[in-house]
A protein has these predicted regions:
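Chalcogenol-based redox active-site neighborhoods
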Residues: 1-241
């Protein structure tokens, strides 16, 4: 495992590590190969804000799984503390936590830059969104006082996956942008010729836009109709026996 201290950057591969979790040992990012995953840290078990976060994450867990995305939690606590906390959440709040929680000794937290000395020895509320290739695509940091918005994290995963698949950019508050609604932004023209062509397309109504550098299209491009070829009927007829 890479033991360097400091936060990895966007575009970096998620550091390789073997960890102990409530679901057993895991090797990251290897065990998540082919899947996206949301790796998030929380300050401590049996704390009010963290409890609300875990309940919120679990409520949305099925939606994350629909996006081929797993959740992995972490704090500097022993695994029995995680298990007991899960039991408390189930018994008192009626929610079963189904995703793994890493029991960290502090090594992982330091390697990812999750501990800020000015805020104590607990991990901050960090989020790393990692794609199916093991590349870090989004990093979010929250202070201990503020719980995370899980709907926003889910939106971020959806947006990045859609952007990758369709070669577009996502506007603010997508899919409810104040200017273009659920439509997505077409990458800006890279040359003068491309810019002129883009303006021409806007004028012809082939695409929508305010200018060559701000054009957009439907989030779901119209698919070409597939021609269904009917099987040819045989000209042969069976003779009656």
């Amino acid at each position: 495992m890479d033991t360097r201290e400091g936060m990895p950057l966007l575009g970096d591969y998620f550091p390789e590590m073997t960890v102990v979790t409530t679901k057993g040992k895991m090797t990251l990012p290897h065990d998540m190969a082919g899947k996206w995953f949301v790796f998030f840290s929380h300050p401590a078990d049996f704390t009010p804000v963290c409890t609300t976060e875990f309940v919120a994450f679990q409520k949305l867990y099925p939606k994350f799984k629909e996006l081929n995305t797993e959740l992995i939690g972490l704090s500097v606590d022993q695994v029995f503390a995680h298990i007991k906390w899960e039991e408390w959440i189930k018994e008192n709040l009626g929610v079963t936590i189904q995703f793994p929680i890493i029991a960290d000794t502090g090594v992982v937290a330091k390697s990812l830059g999750l501990i800020h000395p000015g805020k104590g020895t607990n991990t901050v509320r960090a989020v790393f969104i990692v794609d199916a290739k093991g590349i870090i695509r989004i990093i979010l940091y929250y202070p201990q006082e503020l719980g995370r918005n899980m709907e926003e994290i889910l939106r971020a995963v959806k947006g990045m996956q859609f952007s990758d698949a369709n070669g577009c950019s996502m506007p603010a508050n997508w899919p409810k942008n104040e200017l273009i609604g659920e439509k997505v932004i077409i990458p800006a023209a890279a040359t003068v010729a491309d810019a002129n062509a883009r303006i021409a397309k806007i004028k012809k109504g082939e695409i929508e836009g305010y200018d060559w550098w701000f054009s957009y299209r439907d989030a779901k491009p119209k698919q070409e109709k597939k021609t269904v070829t009917q099987p040819k009927s045989s000209s042969r007829t069976k003779k009656k026996q």
